[in-house]
Design a protein with these regions (language model features):
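A structural detector for beta-sheet-dominated domains
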Residues: 17-19, 45-47, 78-80, 94
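Charge-rich, low-complexity N-terminal segments
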Residues: 1-41
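Generic recognition of long tandem-repeat/solenoid scaffolds
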Residues: 44, 89-93, 102
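Short, well-structured hydrophobic secondary-structure segments
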Residues: 25-70
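Generic detection of short hydrophobic beta-strand segments and adjacent strand-loop junctions
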Residues: 12-16, 55-56, 102
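Mixed-charge, glycine-accented linear interaction segment located at domain edges/termini
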Residues: 94-141
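Short, internal acidic amphipathic alpha-helical interface segments
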Residues: 52-96
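Residues that cap or initiate secondary-structure elements
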Residues: 22, 36, 50-52, 83, ...
Length: 141
């Protein structure tokens, strides 16, 4: 049986840039989060007027999106350059309520990922899942 992790969650505030409906640049703060108890996922919380918006994606998707286009459907990521020529990760989020395309500086995203890898290295995610608990949850419906 795998034992649940004892490491605390990793969180990091990362500024995101986007454009409003009139094409004006906007910057807002987002929280990127990682819980070793859910080792395959990262969580993004967009702190925007009207309330926080939460998204989850695979940690491997975020890592891939730093270097090459990744994802399909609800979340797509790709490396890009901002208007000042700085490396960014572009992220395109689709939901029934709308679409949001944002950019985060690559160095910020990489710093966050490096902190998650220090807690649970890539490829070691399965070691951090309590399989008995997972089966119990699935059977409980």
């Amino acid at each position: 049986m795998s034992q649940p992790p004892t490491a605390p969650p990793v969180t990091q505030e990362i500024p995101l840039q986007c454009e409003d409906e009139l094409g004006r640049p906007l910057t807002f703060v987002s929280s990127f989060g990682y819980d070793p108890g859910d080792p395959y996922a990262v969580w993004l919380t967009f702190h925007i007027p009207g309330g926080d918006v939460h998204w989850a994606m695979a940690r491997s998707l975020l890592a891939t999106g730093i270097d090459e286009p990744a994802g399909e459907g609800d979340i797509c990521l790709w490396p890009n350059l901002d208007s000042d020529g700085r490396a960014v990760v572009s992220m395109d989020f689709h939901s029934p309520e709308g679409r949001l395309v944002v950019e985060a500086r690559t160095r910020d995203v990489y710093q966050f990922l490096a902190r998650t890898w220090a807690v649970v290295p890539p490829g070691a995610e399965a070691d951090n899942v309590d399989l008995d608990e997972l089966v119990d949850e699935l059977l409980a419906g």
